[in-house]
């Protein structure tokens, strides 16, 4: 999700007001933000990932599965082609392959 949403940039802000690694829109998730988070709590990577993971977990539960939950999280619930979920899952696979190659090279050394 982070790779697709922000390209791993913790200071990313969208024109829609989404902030941080997981591109959380503060006005929709005020109740999930810490009271002592300062003016821009979602630009803190730890806070952003905690809130984003909670939002994603709720979305998966509410929508009945990973693909549907990802679609809702990405604001694309009505996309019949499930392009957002496909992008996220492709990014996950790419990262898993890169990690496996890295481990393989490390064990060869």
Task: Report each predicted region and the residues it spans.
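Catalytic glycan-binding domains that act on GlcNAc-containing polysaccharides
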Residues: 1-109
